[in-house]
Amino acid sequence: MLSRKATAVLLAVHAAAMLASQTEAFVPIFTYGEVRRMQEKERYKGQKKSLSVQQRSEEVGPVDPTEPWEEKQEVIKLTAPVEIGMRMNSRQLEKYQATLEGLLREVLPPSRNAQ
């Protein structure tokens, strides 16, 4: 049989888990300092990348503005099926229902039954 302390701890953990599943709040995983360091690293990478692009463009020479400029289009090919999903409780569904319906109308083609 479990001791009273163990039972109290398990009950507290269960209550915290139940409350966490019901809230919509954001729980930070990283501290403010860690986020700031990550942002600085990203900024540094961006500056480094823009410098290398600028150096390459200088090596190629000035671009003639009368020439047509082709934009590089990248296509991402998936090698495995991808499924994106989200879980909502009834309160969240009521709150975001109109927005979700609008997004689905934009993404999905009109069905023949709706006409």
From Swiss-Prot:
Main location: secreted
Region Disordered, residue ranges: 43-72
Keyword Glycoprotein in record: no
Signal peptide coordinates: 1-25
Compartment list: Secreted
GO cellular component, one term: extracellular region
Keywords (A to Z) from UniProt: Cleavage on pair of basic residues, Hormone, Secreted, Signal
MF GO annotations: hormone activity; motilin receptor binding
UniProt xrefs under InterPro entries: Motilin_assoc, Motilin_ghrelin, Promotilin
PANTHER family noted in UniProt: MOTILIN, PROMOTILIN
Family assignment from sequence similarity: Belongs to the motilin family.
Role summary: Plays an important role in the regulation of interdigestive gastrointestinal motility and indirectly causes rhythmic contraction of duodenal and colonic smooth muscle.
Stated name of the protein: Promotilin
